[in-house]
Swiss-Prot record:
This is Small ribosomal subunit protein bS18. Binds as a heterodimer with protein bS6 to the central domain of the 16S rRNA, where it helps stabilize the platform of the 30S subunit. Gene3D superfamilies: Ribosomal protein S18. The keyword Ribonucleoprotein applies. The keyword Phosphoprotein does not apply. Belongs to the bacterial ribosomal protein bS18 family. GO terms for molecular function: small ribosomal subunit rRNA binding; structural constituent of ribosome. It comes from Geobacillus stearothermophilus (Bacillus stearothermophilus). The lineage of its organism: Bacteria, Bacillati, Bacillota, Bacilli, Bacillales. PROSITE patterns: RIBOSOMAL_S18 (PS00057). Coiled coil: none annotated. GO terms for cellular component: cytosolic small ribosomal subunit. Keywords: Ribonucleoprotein, Ribosomal protein, RNA-binding, rRNA-binding.
Length: 78
């Protein structure tokens, strides 16, 4: 039979932005944006970070703007 043996089930991830009452994601806030980027420089998906769809879209736009303004790298250094 498929399924988990023992232990607890998966814990539901909560959206970072709704939990902290953040309504505006600023592209200049590089420290916040770096939390949602992988070590290779890719944007982490919702299933990994737990952000809601609304804030994932805003986050993606902010990261892309920060990359355009050279605040964040497009790819990570080797």
């Amino acid at each position: 039979m498929a399924g988990r043996k023992g232990g607890r089930g998966k814990r539901r991830k909560v959206c970072y932005f709704t939990a902290n009452n953040i309504t505006h994601i600023d592209y200049k806030d590089v420290d916040l944006l770096k939390k949602f980027i992988s070590e290779r420089g890719k944007i982490l998906p919702r299933r990994v970070t737990g952000t809601s769809a609304k804030y994932q879209r805003k986050l993606t736009v902010a990261i892309k703007r920060a990359r355009q303004m050279a605040l964040l790298p497009y790819v990570a250094d080797e």
